[in-house]
Design a protein with these regions (language model features):
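Flexible "arm" and connector segments at domain edges
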Residues: 1-129
Length: 129
């Protein structure tokens, strides 16, 4: 219920164009989500490190150099059969599928490894193994 309440506040702030309200709602959504996850599921001490792992994974979707972007364009087009193009966004390069501008993963993309934050015993307890 807390998260839904914060989402409603976010929606209202967006509709009003209230940038301070938007920031407040986003912070509250994050706080409620991470705080409840940590407390209700015994994840205290894991959430921040896991968040950083997910952030690093998401950042690996973009390319650090134009050369990597060009290589990604070629590879993704060959793999998927769809033409792709890249654009510079800030100091990064993002590869898009040309037909719908879907972001394509860089050749250097890596999936987040969230299991690293658990001991073998913790994983056994949650999977029932």
């Amino acid at each position: 219920d807390f998260i839904l309440e914060e989402l409603e506040e976010y929606k209202e702030a967006c509709e009003k164009g209230d940038i301070v309200g938007i920031l407040d709602a986003l912070c509250d959504i994050t706080y409620v989500s991470l705080g409840n996850g940590a407390l209700l599921h015994g994840l205290k001490g894991k959430v921040w490190e896991a968040y950083q792992e997910v952030q690093a994974s998401n950042m690996s979707k973009s390319c650090e150099t134009q050369e990597i972007a060009e290589q990604t364009v070629i590879l993704r087009a060959e793999e998927k059969g769809h033409p792709c193009h890249w654009e510079q966004v800030g100091d990064r390069y993002v590869v898009y599928r040309s037909s719908d501008n879907k972001v394509m993963k860089s050749i250097n993309y890596f999936a987040p490894d969230l299991k690293q934050f658990f001991t073998d015993e913790e994983l056994r307890q949650t999977t029932g193994s």
